[in-house]
């Protein structure tokens, strides 16, 4: 037995597409019987075709201000709540929950994923127990890197809020992402934390990775924006905070702590152990810092450390070393 019918009344909805204004005729869904938390006679959202909402399962479009059209499919026990606009071949199934969102251009949502008060556009997969919460822009785009077919994914138990995730980025495991910008093929996974704020985001770009129990934290002062570029990695229990820029072939691991003012690492730099680096510091070209080494630039001063060099043990550096002294 069908669980809903389409209203006789139609509603014309206009929307922009490819720089042009399009219009579509929609009809409202009306429940024919009680199921789940829906009662017979309840009016829901608006669709352009009965194929949009499956007659089987408990899936439903709850809000009378929601529009779903142009090749979209809602299946299983999926719930669409709040005012949503969903169009252009979006697929929502299983126990997915969408609340107050704009979804379009081939996005796939399944399993127990939650998406709230966000925009999702482009071919991507949001799945598992992942949560995409308030203020996110998920903008997928393929063909911008060598991995031309890789699609943007957020899955497992990852939580993302107030962030912009674009291109082919991957967020998974138990990662937590707040106020961040993640682009291209960057990855955030395991128990990693990206923790920006309403003033400064955390940036993870290109092929950079944050994983393990690593923490990357933005400050609240001007330019306190931690940025990982190219192939930079922050792993294990490392902590990177404030105005830090990590570039080519940089690995920060162990229990290392970096606090920028500004701090820049580039060209095959490895920081591990319990190393600590603070202040206006530039480290470049085959430098390894390990054990309990400390590098701190004095206030109003800068420090340059260029390799090849190894700094380890209990070494404590507070000024640029003389040539050959290390």
Which residues fall in each region the model found?
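Terminal amphipathic alpha-helical/low-complexity segments used for targeting or macromolecular assembly
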Residues: 1-58, 62-64, 77, 83, ...
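Glycine-rich active-site/cofactor-binding loop and its immediate structural neighborhood
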Residues: 70
